[in-house]
């Protein structure tokens, strides 16, 4: 996999770093750690929305050198929380995020994959929390979807599984896997260690803004590293051929 983003000594006040790492094209990277670990701060920095110490290079150029409009064509970012902007149909909100607004078939396909096919005519300010979360997810997927955006490269997601039930989480995993196979790099924060163990290629484990471990998920999710991050003992079990972590305390 080719390197897409390089972080070197990235830091922000007392909330983050300094930390260094790389993101490769076509990989799923999970940011994990307890609340206050710096995951949201790091994602916002990687999205180019904040500045601070250290440097980030994206696509071979300094992140701060990218024009805002051009950057939005290459990367999409889902904030942890966002209220509906104002009353508009779901289909209209999604269209605003499409590089090619004539691709109605693609809009319908992504909406169907996330269980939104029957909600396209609803107003965004009349949706439940889970419905609005899926609309937001569909929007950022459409923004960088390679079928309509040949320069889409990176998808940054801050706790995308919030408000989603098990079936909806599974549907999102399928969408992300499809994007990954198409070469899109996906960086997302997660609180579900077993989900990360099952679906991520790599993981960065953080605590209080510091990077405890990074690498392949199996290398990061060791009892020693997890104890450092969470202050708990963990056991790793094998359940029907799949590894599973449980707290041992």
Swiss-Prot record:
Catalytic reaction annotation: an R-cob(III)alamin(out) + ATP + H2O = an R-cob(III)alamin(in) + ADP + phosphate + H(+)
Domain of life according to the entry: Bacteria
Domain ABC transporter: 1-233
Residues given in the record as ATP binding sites: 33-40
E.C. code: 7.6.2.8
Alphabetized InterPro entries for the sequence: AAA+_ATPase, ABC_transporter-like_ATP-bd, ABC_transporter-like_CS, ABC_transptr_BtuD, Metal_Ion_Import_ABC, P-loop_NTPase
GO CC list: plasma membrane
Family membership: Belongs to the ABC transporter superfamily. Vitamin B12 importer (TC 3.A.1.13.1) family.
PANTHER family: METAL TRANSPORT SYSTEM ATP-BINDING PROTEIN TM_0124-RELATED, VITAMIN B12 IMPORT ATP-BINDING PROTEIN BTUD
First-tier enzyme category under EC: translocase
The protein's name in its UniProt record: Vitamin B12 import ATP-binding protein BtuD
Pfam families attached to this UniProt entry: ABC_tran (PF00005)
Record's keyword annotation contains Translocase: yes
SS bond list: none
GO MF term list: ABC-type vitamin B12 transporter activity; ATP binding; ATP hydrolysis activity
């Amino acid at each position: 996999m080719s390197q897409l983003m390089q972080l070197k000594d990235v830091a922000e006040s007392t909330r983050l770093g300094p930390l260094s790492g790389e993101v490769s094209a076509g990989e799923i990277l999970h940011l994990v750690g307890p609340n206050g670990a710096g995951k949201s701060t790091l994602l916002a920095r990687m999205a180019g929305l904040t500045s601070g110490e250290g440097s980030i290079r994206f696509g071979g150029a300094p992140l701060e050198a990218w024009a805002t409009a051009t950057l939005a064509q290459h990367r999409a970012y889902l904030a942890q929380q966002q209220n509906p902007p104002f009353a508009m149909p779901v289909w209209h909100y999604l269209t605003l995020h499409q590089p090619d607004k004539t691709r109605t078939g693609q809009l319908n396909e992504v909406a169907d994959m996330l269980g939104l096919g029957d909600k396209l005519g609803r107003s965004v300010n009349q949706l439940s929390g889970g419905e609005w979360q899926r609309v937001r997810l569909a929007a950022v997927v459409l923004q960088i979807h390679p079928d309509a955006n040949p320069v889409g490269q990176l998808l940054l997601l801050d706790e995308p599984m919030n408000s989603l039930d098990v079936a909806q989480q599974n549907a999102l995993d399928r969408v992300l896997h499809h994007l990954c196979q198409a070469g899109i790099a996906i960086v997302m924060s997660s609180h579900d260690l077993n989900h990360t163990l099952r679906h991520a290629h790599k993981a960065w484990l953080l605590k209080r803004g510091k990077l405890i471990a990074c690498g392949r998920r199996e290398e990061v999710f060791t009892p020693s590293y997890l104890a450092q991050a969470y202050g708990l003992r963990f056991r790793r079990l094998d359940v029907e051929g799949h590894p599973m972590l449980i707290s041992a305390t």
